[in-house]
Amino acid sequence: MSLGISISNSIKGFRSSGGGAVDADAQAFITAASITDPTQQSAINQLVVDLKGYSIWSKMKAIYPFVGGTASAHKFNLKDPQDTDAAFRLVFNGGWTHSSTGATPNGTNGWADTFVKTGTDLALNSTHVSV
């Protein structure tokens, strides 16, 4: 039995609430993932601003927006967009299809390593994981 999982994004549905400077964390991700589309840049910025505004940002270890359409863009953690295991970047293994709407494993051997260690990176009895 295999479990099919498709990881998609709906970031293009977000709308910016107005002008202003781009948040430094959003800009770091935009730069690392080479996001050039202004709508996606605005949506990423708004996502970061909103997560911070609702005091959710500091509670998260990793966020993977799956924007940019390639494995090279999809691998970056919005919280720490460095290309290192310690920054919880994704390493895709097996077969994957990457597109502007997200990433889909092949259903046979596709998986991604987050490098998040449950015993050291996550708090006991205070953890939530979403896919």
Identify the meaning behind each predicted range.
Residues 2-129:
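Extracytoplasmic low-complexity segments
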